[in-house]
């Protein structure tokens, strides 16, 4: 269990450093069970719940996502589920997640609704369909 926590806190610190490099002020709330990082820059507020796994499939408790959404609404920030999945950093709008039970399933299909770090901070590149053909 301790190793699992260490992996998660390492990812939180990595994301915190990336956000700070981009000019965000960041607060890490370790052990919060619902909100791990709060980042702000010039009136923009981003709120993250961070999860990491080396498995091809894992589960996130529905209550963790509900806490993220609730806190974000009260605080006035934009919520993101930040996932380090098989070494790749992905960000998901929690409103796009769906569940039939107590947990959300995270697997390769999550990439269909995920965005990358630069899209989260507003520096993403938008592609036109013509560019892909």
UniProtKB/Swiss-Prot annotation:
A Pfam short name: Hjc
Annotated site residues (Transition state stabilizer) in this chain: 51
Cofactor note: Binds 1 Mg(2+) ion per subunit.
Self-association and partners: Homodimer.
HAMAP family noted in UniProt: HJ_Resolv_Hjc
Family in the record: Belongs to the Holliday junction resolvase Hjc family.
Name listed for the protein in its UniProt record: Crossover junction endodeoxyribonuclease Hjc
């Amino acid at each position: 269990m301790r190793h699992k926590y260490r992996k998660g806190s390492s990812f939180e610190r990595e994301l915190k450093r990336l956000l700070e490099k981009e000019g965000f002020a960041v607060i890490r709330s370790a052990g919060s069970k619902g909100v791990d990082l709060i980042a702000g820059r010039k009136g923009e507020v981003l709120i993250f719940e961070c999860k990491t796994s080396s498995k091809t499939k894992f589960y996130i408790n529905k209550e963790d996502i509900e806490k993220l959404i609730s806190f974000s609404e009260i605080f006035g920030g934009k919520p993101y589920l930040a996932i380090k999945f098989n070494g790749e950093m992905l960000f998901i709008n929690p409103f796009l997640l769906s569940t039939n039970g107590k947990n959300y399933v995270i697997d390769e299909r999550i990439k269909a609704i995920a965005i990358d770090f630069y899209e989260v901070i507003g520096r993403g590149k938008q592609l036109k369909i013509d560019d892909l053909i």
